[in-house]
Amino acid sequence: MNQRPIQTATLSWNEQGTPVSEQFGDIYFSNEDGLEETHHVFLKGNGFPARFASHPQQSCIFAETGFGTGLNFLTLWRDFALFRQQSPNATLRRLHYISFEKYPLHVADLASAHARWPELASFAEQLRAQWPLPLAGCHRILLADGAITLDLWFGDVNTLLPTLDDSLNNQVDAWFLDGFAPAKNPDMWNEQLFNAMARMTRPGGTFSTFTAAGFVRRGLQQAGFNVTKVKGFGQKREMLTGTLPQQIHAPTAPWYHRPAATRCDDIAIIGGGIVSALTALALQRRGAVVTLYCADAQPAQGASGNRQGALYPLLNGKNDALETFFTSAFTFARRQYDQLLEQGIAFDHQWCGVSQLAFDDKSRGKIEKMLHTQWPVEFAEAMSREQLSELAGLDCAHDGIHYPAGGWLCPSDLTHALMMLAQQHGMTCHYQHELQRLKRIDNQWQLTFGQSQAAKHHATVILATGHRLPEWEQTHHLPLSAVRGQVSHIPTTPVLSQLQQVLCYDGYLTPVNPANQHHCIGASYQRGDIATDFRLTEQQENRERLLRCLPQVSWPQQVDVSDNQARCGVRCAIRDHLPMVGAVPDYAATLAQYQDLSRRIQHGGESEVNDIAVAPVWPELFMVGGLGSRGLCSAPLVAEILAAQMFGEPLPLDAKTLAALNPNRFWIRKLLKGRPVQTRSPATQESSR
């Protein structure tokens, strides 16, 4: 997925005060009454709001071509909120709205357009507060305490549609086929769009559109829709509505299939870190019943227990799955952390910005590659030594890249607060429960703990045990590594207290935390080492790295590690630096089932390829891990992905990126190339018990 910045909308305003697209030379909504037009064409055209009451599932999925000012979305949201007030016991509880927009508006233009509809003001204000930067790809926005999920896909709809993954097949309940008039925007209205709509629509799903153009009607009919002409809005004589009578076959990549959970009313999460807490909350937003088991006496005793952690995206300039994921993850994380703060969830933090320094030739080359993309300056920007030093408050000694929305937060504070929030929402926690064995018995998972503790049984299990993930029989073959990291806690000084931003070099240094008057500097990186004892050599090395990377300036000499204050944790790392999230793959079954996968794809007929079975997984067993040293950035999005997968919902990333997060990816890549999968013993197989 191309995450490069995209062109924003250029607007003018006509005599009626209606916004006009300069790109398409067309108005965004009717000069007569845009709100009434939306109600007539898109809501009533699809049978809403009347359909809310009879909807048989807890979630209703809408898709739209052309988000524009968001008028359709805001009107639907308002009507749904009214429905929920009037029918609190109805089956339907959540809306999922997927919209494609080639030229997103600036937030100031949104505000000007929204001013015309004071009745939508409260909803529009919430939308604008979460409005994403103009980066191509999916921006998942959670509104109304999770009752509304908005997936904004920025980019050309016909470029985006082929990149979508299987989770959108046969899912959409209603389409708002909007966008500018076919005569003004002919590239959008084509066979590819109509066929994709049919593929994504569930049987009985509907569409409506303002146009009655003959080629649109014929294209939708050929794609499989039953199409009807009805009265248009205002002076427009006709418009089109329709229904998909039967499911349309959709091609899939079965080797990367992501199964939903059969039961979400009895989920056990194993783990006590930040991703465990975020996953619990993401599941609870959807109505899941969650029980958490943690080996320690309290949460955040592992890698999530540090005092300060830097939050910034991982870029590489390759426009690949890694850059796509971390761009989306970073922006999603900031939105979610800000929402938590607005809810009164307290944790030490400063959104002070992060500066990544070009301290040697290798790091300079990496940063130059990152900056080949002309990122929005609100996301990332090249800066000189002088510019970085002015922002940081101390001489940075080097040029670099600046992330203005980055900063630091206290992982320990945040994890504790999230656990408390999940408990307030009904999660049961069992601390000092160290999982010893996991066994499938009678369609349930039996969890065996210490000798004095009774075994527990749950329908569905999520493993989120960090570097201990490969300890279980079911996860033994996953290529995960344990990496020890010691972070030094250093007292501030009058000079160090001037540091205003997180500095990243061959290590990192945080600004002073006002809560304890200390900075954090780190961290060591000892692969395969799971000990958490204090080590003087690593304490001194943390300081030496700063001195080596900034030899031109004197202020790093102020860093004093002599009081030996530090904390050590063990990360769970993967060689491609991407997390693993999804169902736990069955290693032996995968190798047996896909031993001739490459031949079947390359030389088999169409029927043989279509007969390839979905990837084998352990039933009702899921995992999230391998977050490495970027957990603060990646944890919110991987938690959301896992919860959405388990509930069978559309996922907020393209197919290529989701494949790169699949726990079976290393095996499948080799099998697709016809290469043998080597059985190996990852470093994490040494037990910490």
Curated annotation (Swiss-Prot):
Organism: Yersinia pseudotuberculosis serotype O:1b (strain IP 31758)
Keyword Transferase on entry: yes
EC number, UniProt record: 2.1.1.61, 1.5.-.-
Stretch list, region FAD-dependent cmnm(5)s(2)U34 oxidoreductase: 270-689
Protein name, per record: tRNA 5-methylaminomethyl-2-thiouridine biosynthesis bifunctional protein MnmC
Family in the record: In the N-terminal section; belongs to the methyltransferase superfamily. tRNA (mnm(5)s(2)U34)-methyltransferase family. In the C-terminal section; belongs to the DAO family.
Cofactors: FAD
Keyword Signal assigned: no
Annotated GO MF terms: flavin adenine dinucleotide binding; oxidoreductase activity, acting on the CH-NH group of donors; tRNA (5-methylaminomethyl-2-thiouridylate)(34)-methyltransferase activity
Function in brief: Catalyzes the last two steps in the biosynthesis of 5-methylaminomethyl-2-thiouridine (mnm(5)s(2)U) at the wobble position (U34) in tRNA. Catalyzes the FAD-dependent demodification of cmnm(5)s(2)U34 to nm(5)s(2)U34, followed by the transfer of a methyl group from S-adenosyl-L-methionine to nm(5)s(2)U34, to form mnm(5)s(2)U34.
Catalytic activity: 5-aminomethyl-2-thiouridine(34) in tRNA + S-adenosyl-L-methionine = 5-methylaminomethyl-2-thiouridine(34) in tRNA + S-adenosyl-L-homocysteine + H(+)
Record region (tRNA (mnm(5)s(2)U34)-methyltransferase): 1-245
Gene name linked to the record: mnmC
This protein's UniProt keywords: Cytoplasm, FAD, Flavoprotein, Methyltransferase, Multifunctional enzyme, Oxidoreductase, S-adenosyl-L-methionine, Transferase, tRNA processing
Alphabetical GO biological process terms: methylation; tRNA wobble uridine modification
Subcellular location: Cytoplasm
Any one cellular-component term (Gene Ontology): cytoplasm
